[in-house]
């Protein structure tokens, strides 16, 4: 009897023909619904009890979905790193394995943060806009070496952001709920401190932590009040870490100077969001993971994780291109 897999990862669906030889080799039938950004709870419930494994993006695997899909569902293989959209407690209760690719998008996300800092410091987007509107206006900028960076969440991405900041001779503050390795502190000169000190001393604040109960709405009216009036908030992690209305209020009141956002509390960002009309805000559609090399690695590791979770004994010497790629990924 063929195993069935609900295949809903938006970044993989366009290339599904590349992956089919692997699934055919192991007699896996794919269920591929139409997906825009993600599958919501009600969308997933339509397939409850009909699949053995899942390859997903940010689909809403709530406790209700997990309970409805058990006991048939054995593994959820997440494309990417973040698993905050999956109810881990419910999966544990029903013995459903959750898999992901750690350190998947460290480099492109860190590059994105650096790009935002340079844009706000050197003011290129704003000068370009003025020039194209027929205005010859010199907008004052600053060097990154004159700025301090606060990194909230000093994991893989936070460390990569700090290393980039070090190359620009920035003062770096860090905050994390776990102890950071002494060798990294010595390498970068990062000053690990409490959140209040970080916020009150940083010209740029980069959010690079996971979304969890300790970080939900970490940035709110109280924490925005601690920031410098010339400071810029950068969020390339998860939208709900920032209380969006509090951010809008802080920007409108001039409590902070600007924001660069790749993620939002609701995605896609509603068309009536005040953020869309703010000149001191840079926006992107959750795209900081964009990197052909990173995507390729994650595609195949997601498949490998699925096979592992289904208990499939895959061959390291399979002749097909797809399975050979899976084998190479497994060896890494």
Report residues per predicted region.
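N-terminal glycine-/charge-rich "phosphate-binding" loop or analogous flexible N-terminal tail
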Residues: 1-51, 328-332
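Conserved acidic E/D residue at the C-terminus of a beta-strand in Rossmann-like folds
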Residues: 176
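Oxidoreductase and adenylate-handling cofactor-binding alpha/beta cores
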Residues: 110-129, 163-170, 300-308
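C-terminal helix-to-coil terminal segments
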Residues: 2, 14, 18-19, 25, ...
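Short acidic/histidine-rich motifs immediately flanking catalytic phosphotransfer sites
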Residues: 48-53, 71-73, 201-204, 228-230
